[in-house]
């Protein structure tokens, strides 16, 4: 049951994943990304994040951008596991978790003077959502679902040993549990840097991003019930606590009467009942995690005539999160313990071309170096060896982007774009607690020059995810075969204002 609670809390730790980008990175920091996607060769205000060397080609002056996004995500896991039939009668169950971030803010600023530009931005660079799981997950429920079979098997063993005359647990084939989990994950990033235009065509950027992680998890597992002996549903913990007391009273009486044979029998019953009662006791957790790390960033931009090329490299961010635990009767989240939480290095390359004075197109490429980032430990299912989850990733994440923008008139632009995301994770990485599914993302929107130096951007962005099927002969560590099918949905709305002083 300790393993049960670890799994259910584990799902929280990774449940509030990013809305666009790699395993732990948000790339949708500006509304211009939402409405065009391929922004890696930008020379507008959003270049502060997407192409920081490109700000050297902005107009002289002070530029400011304020953005707000609303993101809504669902995760759906269809799990098939024979013992699930003990709770509802169906071996296949659909588990759905919802994560939402009603408001994700970001601020961009640039001061440009001749060959120099100084830029900064503040944004939610990772996570950004809260997730609630009211019905648990398959990996969680699988460990509860085997309780009826475990009791029947234990009864047979006690009969074989002569401890019980008959198996009083025969007929136990149903279970239920009350579980609740809620989690949030936020990575706040403050980026500062300087860009210098080396020649009329070439500029370079150097800067850093300070990252602060704030995670929070709370949950409980209560009232595990079973129809013991085929009877009514009863609380398993209370049943075996009472059973243990009765057996201990009988054992003490036989010991006092010097009846050692019956003493040994009832002593064994008391010990087994106490063990089951402990395993099925209620569990609770209330824990926060915090940590910080620094990301060095370098960039280059080459601009000539109608062409622009931008390159950015973000170094791997070494980062640990520390437990700040208020309640934990599981023994799994000790106060003060640190867990690896690195942000993978990122390489981006973008090319833009002005097809016509009113028509522009861009393409981009992202590569996340996921295999080099330290992650929380997990067990290799075959060997049982504990290692960082990065060892279960075959190759880093690759993203391919394209977008186009058209000036409808002097004061309005429309744009659209798409992105293909390909994850390199293997079966051992995937679980209903943490899964990455390759996808296609689409965005469209418009920009409106509502005043001489003021621009309004609006956009809608959504993602179509593939389905990933994982079959295992040891579902949830139970020794019984099972299958999960993973998929997700993602929708983001954005609005922003760009102003030049």
Q: Which stretches of residues belong to each language-model region?
A:
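Residues that define the transmembrane beta-barrel architecture of outer-membrane proteins
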Residues: 46, 100-105, 186-190, 290-296, ...
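Residue-level signature of outer-membrane beta-barrel architecture
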Residues: 56, 110-113, 192, 196, ...
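Repeated loop/turn-to-beta-strand initiation elements of outer-membrane beta-barrel proteins
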Residues: 62, 115-118, 201-204, 306-309, ...
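Transmembrane beta-barrel strands of outer-membrane/channel proteins
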Residues: 64-72, 120-124, 206-210, 311-315, ...
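Outer-membrane beta-barrel translocator domains and adjoining extracellular loop/strand segments
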Residues: 76-83, 131-137, 216-225, 231, ...
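Extracellular loop and loop/strand-boundary signature of outer-membrane beta-barrel proteins
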Residues: 90-95, 175-180, 281-287, 332-338, ...
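Outer-membrane beta-barrel "beta-signal"
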Residues: 446-448, 460, 487-501
């Amino acid at each position: 049951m300790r393993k049960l609670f670890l799994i259910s809390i584990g799902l929280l730790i990774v449940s509030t994943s990013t809305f666009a980008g790699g395993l732990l990175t948000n790339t949708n920091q500006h509304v211009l990304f939402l409405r065009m996607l391929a922004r890696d060769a930008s020379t507008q205000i959003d270049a502060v994040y997407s192409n920081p060397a490109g700000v050297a080609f902005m107009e002289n002056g002070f530029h400011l951008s304020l953005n707000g996004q609303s993101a809504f995500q669902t995760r759906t896991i269809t799990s098939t596991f024979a013992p699930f039939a003990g709770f509802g009668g169906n071996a296949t169950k659909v588990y759905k978790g919802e994560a939402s971030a009603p408001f994700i803010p970001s601020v961009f600023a640039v001061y440009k003077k001749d060959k120099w530009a100084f830029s900064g931005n503040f944004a939610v660079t990772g996570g950004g959502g809260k997730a609630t799981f009211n019905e648990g997950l398959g990996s969680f429920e699988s460990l509860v679902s085997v309780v009826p079979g475990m009791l029947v098997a234990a009864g047979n063993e006690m009969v074989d040993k002569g401890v019980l005359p008959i198996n009083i647990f025969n007929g136990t084939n149903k279970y239920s549990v009350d579980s609740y989990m809620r989690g949030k994950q936020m990575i706040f990033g403050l980026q500062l840097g300087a860009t210098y235009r080396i020649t009329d065509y070439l500029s370079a950027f150097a800067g850093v991003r300070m990252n602060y992680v704030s995670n929070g998890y709370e949950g409980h597992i209560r009232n595990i019930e079973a129809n013991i002996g085929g009877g009514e549903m009863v609380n398993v913990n209370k049943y075996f606590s009472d059973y243990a007391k009765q057996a201990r009273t009988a054992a003490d009486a036989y010991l006092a009467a010097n009846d050692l044979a019956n003493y040994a029998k009832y002593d064994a019953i008391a010990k087994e009942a106490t063990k089951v009662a402990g395993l099925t006791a209620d569990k609770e957790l209330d824990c926060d995690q915090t940590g910080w790390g620094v990301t060095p960033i370098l960039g280059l931009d080459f601009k000539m005539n109608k062409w622009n090329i931008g390159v950015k490299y973000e170094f791997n961010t070494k980062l640990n999160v520390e437990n700040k635990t208020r309640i934990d009767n599981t023994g799994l989240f000790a106060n003060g313990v640190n867990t690896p939480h690195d942000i993978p290095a990122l390489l981006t390359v973008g090319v833009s071309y002005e097809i016509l004075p009113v028509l522009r197109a861009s393409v981009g490429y992202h590569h996340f170096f996921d295999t080099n980032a330290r992650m929380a430990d997990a067990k290799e299912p075959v060997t049982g060896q504990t290692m960082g989850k990065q060892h279960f990733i075959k190759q880093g994440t690759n993203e391919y982007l394209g977008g186009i923008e058209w000036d409808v008139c002097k004061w309005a632009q429309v744009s659209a774009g798409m992105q293909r995301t390909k994850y390199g994770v293997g079966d051992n990485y995937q679980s209903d607690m943490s899964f990455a599914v390759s996808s296609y993302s689409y965005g469209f929107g418009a920009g409106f020059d509502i005043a001489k130096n003021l621009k309004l951007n609006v956009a809608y962005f959504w993602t179509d995810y593939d389905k990933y099927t994982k079959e295992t002969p040891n579902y949830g560590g139970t020794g019984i075969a099972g299958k999960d099918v993973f998929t997700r949905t993602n929708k983001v709305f954005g609005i922003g204002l760009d102003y030049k002083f």
